[in-house]
Amino acid sequence: IPMENQIRKQATVGVFAVGHAVYWGQFPGLLDKLMIYHADFVKLLEKQGVKVVDFGMSDSSERAYEMLDRIKASGVDLLFCNMVTYATSSVFAPIARDSGLPIVLTALQPLANLDYTQANTRMQLENDCICAVPEYMGVAARMNRKIYDVIIGCLYNDEKADGEIAKWCNIAKALHGLK
């Protein structure tokens, strides 16, 4: 077999953020802020030597179904669900059930510590990344779909979380090599 036929393109990971569309009208600017955090997460993935396909925000069940079609057509090797705020499982369940991909949940809050003397609902929603993890895990279990990992930590300057992201990107590379 000629060497050029043995060379494979780089691994591709998919990523999508989850949110709750009801919040956008209640908290002007929240969606934009969360998408900045999502873009920063995408940059963390890109540093790992993988191609990244960003599917954007799933914030309703309708959007989840629309996104699912794009995910299935993309050929990604692994999928990250970026939990940027609380979101109902309806924005995640169709993707988990029908994508056929290994999924890793990421719950990386932007702030290392919340200033509870200044706390408000908006601040909570910007850092509420872990809240829906039990709900998502339960939904996946009821659908007999495995969630391969949950990466919990801070979005910025968190070596442990960065290491876990690197591990899963390396797993995506291995999965790609098996294709």
Describe each region flagged by the PLM.
Residues 1-179:
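An N-terminal assembly and electron-transfer interface module characteristic of large anaerobic redox
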